[in-house]
Curated annotation (Swiss-Prot):
One biological process term in Gene Ontology: double-strand break repair via homologous recombination
Topological relation to the membrane, as annotated: Peripheral membrane protein
Function, in words: As part of AP-5, a probable fifth adaptor protein complex it may be involved in endosomal transport.
UniProt keywords, alphabetically: Cytoplasm, DNA damage, DNA repair, Endosome, Lysosome, Membrane, Protein transport, Transport
Protein name: AP-5 complex subunit sigma-1
InterPro entries: AP-5_subunit_s1
Coiled coil: none
Gene: Ap5s1
Species whose genome carries this gene: Mus musculus (Mouse)
Subcellular localization: Cytoplasm, Cytosol; Late endosome membrane; Lysosome membrane
Amino acid sequence: MVHAFLIHTLRAPNLEDTGLCRVLYSCVFGAEKSPDDPRSHGAERDRLFRKEQILAVARQVESLCRLQQQAAGCSSTDLQPQFSAEPVSLHEAPHGAFHLAAGDPFQEPRTVLWLGILSLGFALVLDTHENLLLAERTLRLLARLLLDHLRLLTPAVSTGAAYCRAHPSR
């Protein structure tokens, strides 16, 4: 079962800490109560608890991605956005999986599958017994579809000019 999907920022390797890892989007499937107290804490406290869990996963993904890039000897610009007509290769993108022990940060053990593309990290938080090959294909498909959709928002595309050409009377 997939427990969470998240998209977050990735800082380039070999750079000073110029910013924090930021979670741009997350979706948690199911709820986990705080391990300290079995009583209900209320919606706000549960939301903050889930937010902390997701941020912990994002930081670990960012750390592993930076480590992999540094070990491969990649330059600091490899994870920066590239506004060109060339498609982004998902097969060459840094990726990996790691295991989270029970209590770190989830109550049950989990597996995290991640993919780093440009300056974005995509991650799935899974049960430990999930099919990782199927999950990796799903994560790559999600990332490709999201990047294709977001390509409309890049500075290289002038949506206003395209709209004016398509609707000359307006």
